[in-house]
Amino acid sequence: MLRQVLHRGLRTCFSRLGHFIASHPVFFASAPVLISILLGASFSRYQVEESVEHLLAPQHSLAKIERNLVNSLFPVNRSKHRLYSDLQTPGRYGRVIVTSYQKANMLDQHHTDLILKLHTAVTKIQVPRPGFNYTFAHICVLNNDKTCIVDDIVHVLEELKNARATNRTNFAITYPITHLKDGRAVYNGHQLGGVTVHSKDRVKSAEAIQLTYYLQSINSLNDMVAERWESSFCDTVKLFQKSNSKVKIYPYTSSSLREDFQKTSRVSERYLVTSLILVVTMAILCCSMQDCVRSKPWLGLLGLVTISLATLTAAGIINLTGGKYNSTFLGVPFVMLGHGLYGTFEMLSSWRKTREDQHVKERTAEVYADSMLSFSLTTAMYLVTFGIGASPFTNIEAARIFCCNSCIAILFNYLYVLSFYGSSLVFTGYIENNYQHSIFCRKVPKPDVLQEKPAWYRFLLTARFSEETAEGEEANTYESHLLVCFLKRYYCDWITNTYVKPFVVLFYLIYISFALMGYLQVSEGSDLSNIVATATQTIEYTTAHQKYFNNYSPVIGFYIYESIEYWNSSVQEDVLEYTKGFVRISWFESYLNYLRKLNVSTDLPKKNFTDMLRNSFLKTPQFSHFQEDIIFSKKYNDEVDVVASRMFLVAKTMETNREELYDLLETLRRLSVTSKVKFIVFNPSFVYMDRYASSLGAPLHNSCISALFLLFFSAFLVADSLINVWITLTVVSVEFGVIGFMTLWKVELDCISVLCLIYGINYTIDNCAPLLSTFVLGKDFTRTKWVKNALEVHGVAILQSYLCYIVGLFPLAAVPSNLTCTLFRCLFLIAFVTFFHCFAILPVILTFLPPSKKKRKEKKNPENREEIECVEMVDIDSTRVVDQITTV
């Protein structure tokens, strides 16, 4: 009873609102336009988000805390050349991979000379500034001896060249650790790629060589010069490529990921314009019919104008509040399109059900009462699900900003549909009531006048006048609409046919089977190359890197951040045990080996251990570089202690798998908690992958929970709680299918796909809720009858919005970008699976599942008695008289 009272009360409120808007259409049409123009003017403050880490790395993670601790001990910007990472290296740098088209050995004489020539060209790059020309020597990261840090492979190649010049045959390169001329042991696993080795790790050949040039960015001027140097670096490498066509060179800089991420927006522009044109065309066609008076092409266009105004308003608010644009915002218009188009088409469908002899204000009031309640509830669902995604619970900033922008856009879209589109409906209603042409707004002449006109004129001005319509045919004036005719005359009977139902059930079982197969293979995508445009430096570099340099993980820093008893043999065993199984670049292990070579016990007293470390080991040229890895402190009694130190570890991997690397990170962290030695591990790439899985799933998880809560509480607003049960089951079925087929279509669960899945919850409710509501609330007739009725009432609006949405999505598939490719595949699957449920699964399943539609037996009473009438029927052929008993 309470539900019915609330339901009727809300319908009455919307009816009065519709009547009020119909009474003041000019104001409600102009106000949204003025607001959009005023807020849209804020595009003069348009800004683009520069930091990819800010957008895509989890905001709250242990890796960021570890980075701060590491920075306080050993500044990452100074040690980034030793903490190698592919795409996540901090600061400014230029990087290049050199390979050969014929898979030649890059260590032979020709290619060695070529690479050294490229190195010389890079170091001579000049960045002109007023009064001074900066070269690499001026902006490079410096060693302790004030020389530029250059990759060790350059020294190896120079030694190799000198050995060939002097005919020395005893020079050998080992892999992944080799020794330089001065005796230093260095790691070259990320500098030599595609390596073939002899016995004892001696390198036979290498198919690729990677060089990295690290730059300073300690102040704004330095950063600006470094940025320009990176640009000149790419130009120099490309020129070198043109003059040496037998080698393939892949340049990459610290700016490449950011530029290629934002490049998606630029390459998408013409495709989005094409999409807009297609949607406008389809919307106009969907609202058109042969009857030139009742056709509503302008409403199709104005529906898109409504969505555009709402999007513009939301963008203006984001700009005014200091928000910055990023390429993930490309999905917002499609979120708006899916929600806004259905709302406008549902209003138009409700308009067609009103009586033509009513006044426009009364018809508008009926439209609002009929369609705005369900549209308001679905809008509330959008606001709740995206609102939870926009909350601080969302740990990935790109997802939070997207949800926040979508919330604002959805809210204004709802308000503008109520006001702008509603007033547009009023204006077209007056045009219809005055029998004016729906496009040209010219009075349509009566049929007797049209008979005297040419055929083309009669075709353009075909209309059905009320005088031609019989009293009982009033409701059928819109049946000449193609989609209405198709659903009512053909599709509804076909889908509910007894012989069709088994095939639909079979298709659904196949759908569930394939969805389950994909669901069991879901993988999380934390690869940053999945969000950039294709045919870019990032994609080319990443492809080459994965091909040639996938044998070892990024270099992991192993930091002991408190003073421990390094001289104690048990502590030594613990430290060696923790690092066992890794390729190690360790001062500690080198020092212990140094002591053994001197026939000195490693179990020395503290003072002797420390003094020999400082005064002997670190003064030896081949070990002097380890001074950067140890922090000493003097106590009050002049006793020296090692307060912190670091080592570098590299894991052997079959391929650079981020999930495998994350598992390694978690294993080392668990070990650090239980071990006697307090240490942390860090690599710049950990900032992106730490808690990425939980951060990624949190918005979807929270949105699903909030959607369930909203469906539960909205059960008091709908006339029957069974509606919400059916909606929940439908959403689960759709989301399960989308996730499964998304995986089979090689789409990983990343930031973009999670946002699409949140949208999929709302899109499903948008389209399925009216169908289910009409079916559940239907009484007296059979299930089949109410399934047909639900399709006839709401199917046209669903079909119209689906057609417009799909034609708008297709150009997105052609955009040369991984981000838009993910966006297209997810949105297409959401639309297709939802359509499949609306027009196939639900119409069939509802015909044999609850609620029951059996006619309740009426109590016998004096006012409701059956009257029996005898009717005599004469059989003409046999002249027999037949008595037939009929019930009246």
Swiss-Prot record:
GO biological process, one term: smoothened signaling pathway
Statement: the UniProt record of this protein carries the keyword Nucleus: no
Membrane disposition: Multi-pass membrane protein
Keywords, ordered alphabetically: Cell membrane, Cell projection, Glycoprotein, Membrane, Synapse, Transmembrane, Transmembrane helix
GO cellular component: dendritic spine; plasma membrane; synapse
InterPro entries: Patched_domain-protein, PTHD_SSD, SSD
Entry function: Required for the development and function of the thalamic reticular nucleus (TRN), a part of the thalamus that is critical for thalamocortical transmission, generation of sleep rhythms, sensorimotor processing and attention. Can bind cholesterol in vitro.
UniProt protein name: Patched domain-containing protein 1
Species assigned in the record: Mus musculus (Mouse)
This protein's encoding gene: ptchd1
